[in-house]
Amino acid sequence: MRYTYVRQHDTTDCAAACLAMVCLHYKKEITITRLRDMMGTDLKGTNLTGMEKAAQELGFSTAAVRVDRENFLSEFTTPCIAQVITDEGLAHFVTVFKKTTIKDDGERRRHMLRQEEERKKCADEGKKFKCRDYVIIGDPAKELKKISLDEFYKNFTGVLLLMTPTSEFKTGKQKQGSMVKRFLDLLWPQKKLFFYAILSSVILTIIGIASSMYNKILMDEILPYGLKSLLVAVILVFSIVNVTSALISMVRQWVLIYLSIKVDIPLMLGYFGHVFKLPMKFFATRKTGEITTRYSDASTIKSVFTSIALSVVMDVVMACVTGVILFRMNATLFSISIFTTLLSILLVFIFKQPFKRINEETMQQSAILNSQMIESLRGIETVKCNAEEDRELEALEREYIKSLKISLRSSKISTVQSLISTLITTILGMVTSYVGIMQVLNGEMTLGGYMAFSTLSSYFTNPVSELVSLQMSIQQAQISIKRLTEIMDYESEQDETREYTEMEKIDGDIEFKDVSFRYGSRSPALSHVSFTIPYGKKVALVSSSGSGKSTITKLLLKYYEPESGTISVGGVDLDEYSNASVRRAIAYVPQNVELFSKTIYDNIRISRPEASLDEVKAAAKKADAHEFIRKLPLQYNTYLEEAGNGLSGGEKQRLALARAFLKDANLYILDESTSSLDFGTENTIFDMIYNQLADRSMLIVAHRLSTIRDCDLILVMDHGEIVERGTHEELLEKQGKYYELWSLQQGIFRDKKRGSKPAAPVSAAKVVEDEDDGESITY
């Protein structure tokens, strides 16, 4: 029986790859990218709830069960998905295709007892017990393999997801855009260049075939009759032909280079242009290395289509033309050449699957290694402050060694294929020589004819030899096409066919009405949240970490859509507005400030590219950033290092605040925007906010409650719900959750369970850590 195997693209793709295998078993083809979305896969992977949800959506009846060893041998539907723990201690999923099955309960128990007795006997005799029970699994990170039940149970957690297709299950192939068609669309505007490349190739082919007649004329016409005058003419003609061939070859190479560049620009920029249009969910659930390696995929595809594809087309044409000539010259020798070609084609098919597996492993490991390097360099300060350089280097070394091992296996496969190909060509070439020379000796063929045949036969056999040598590159391009197509087919964050209203300014109340939301298939981040931000009022969100404050800001910025409920601005549903116009109308300062390798002036005016230097300076003064900028060597023209390295956390936050103030929006969202500032600077900035921006709407997410005590409304959140609301004074009078947080920060909260001893004063920064709702969701 043939089993359907799908390799994962990334370490978090195992669940999606397993479900893709099950779907393929039932004749349904669906991409890993689509399944990731259906499951709610994120950087932590996928949980069982997400897998069940996706399977049911596809039309499967599902049951998550826990089985012991005896029950695993009972009869149940396969393929199914099993949870295992890898040797590195990570949760992982594999597909179970087939296993030892004993239907009768009594026989199964007797089987287990017999097996236990055999184990004891082997242990007593010092022998190794050989388990005859087997499991055939598809491990998306490794391979399809048959292992013993003992080996399987070393990693099996006992959890299975059983799946049976229902009447709602639909077979068929998921509709995908064709990467080949996309590429041909890129080539079409360059059709003139492509035509020149083909024309030059045809001319070179004709010249090559004509040149093969040189030896025949020399051997059969000139040497036997001593035609010295004709010799000079023939040499002169063929010299001109060869020089012409060299010049045309050079022109062809220039055309191909220029064609490659002309295709490269729209292909590469088109990929990143599409990536920038993707929703935040896409970036939040993927590692940076996984996204950047698709750039390499695009480069691989371009290389194949602009050079290899053209060569293959011309090689095929050349093989057909020379094949006809060779057949007419000598049918016997031609049959040997045909046999050589057929063996070479057979060799390509034999090595197709090994090359496919090794290419998939190479690409997956490349993404993992890139992500590891990016994470290590991005977190270098944390690595150094904890003196973890050696440990981080060990982790990087492990991934690099894995890459080298895969590369070594790839080289071994290529070497074996190359050796077999060389043997086929050499042995059959010798056979051709023997038969040809015998025909010359027997007078059945002239020496010149034989030499011409030998020269021409290379034009016939070389295309297939080239195909064999390029098989790795071609199959790598096929995998790259599949991976890149999945990204290019990923839906943009906004429907480009729909007409949206453009938001000029936020000039009304903002209302959240019964809004619920969750990240993927995780626990709800928000549950039935309702509140209003009156126009021109200041509203604060407070809570302990992971309660949903930042999620509210992300929904308001249209990074995500609510699972249920509505968000409206001035009575109009937020969904009616285009994403870009909503974000332009809001001045947002996130928790994590991102600065770019540009001047300070350019970094601040990102929010308003047309802003003058005077306007940027005015915004910097509001953010209390002007003074520290003046002390820099080139002041506002100072070029920042990558990610603003060299600036303190407080300086980065002040630049981010300057961006927001430069935008001069009607709604400001400050998400822990002053957490790195000292109390004096923080108070200065909030005094400016309450005075100079008194008429602007504002949503402030804060842990330091002293900064939001003057807000018009304070919302207290707990586990995704609003548990209290009111002004600072009203909430203190209630002596509820807000009172506890305030008292804790003021150092006067008493632990009622332990007595009346006052708690030691603790700064707000020590009470709670910076919130990241995406990271605080539990399984």
Regions from the language model: what does each represent?
Residues 1-210, 224, 228-233, 252, ...:
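Membrane-integrated ABC transporters
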Residues 117, 123, 503-779:
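ABC-type nucleotide-binding domain
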Residues 194-248, 255, 327-332, 443-447:
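Transmembrane helix-loop-helix hairpins at lipid-water interfaces of multipass membrane proteins
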Residues 198, 202-213, 243-250, 301-304, ...:
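Hydrophobic alpha-helical transmembrane bundles that constitute the permease/transmembrane domains
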Residues 215-216, 256, 274-321, 378, ...:
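Juxtamembrane loop-to-helix connectors within ABC transporter transmembrane domains
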Residues 236-245, 249, 311-361, 431-445, ...:
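Transmembrane helices of ABC transporter permease
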Residues 273-290, 361-409, 481, 499-501, ...:
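Loop segments that connect adjacent transmembrane helices in multi-pass transporters
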Residues 365, 369, 381-388, 412, ...:
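Cytosolic ends of transmembrane helices, especially the final helix of ABC transmembrane type-1 domains
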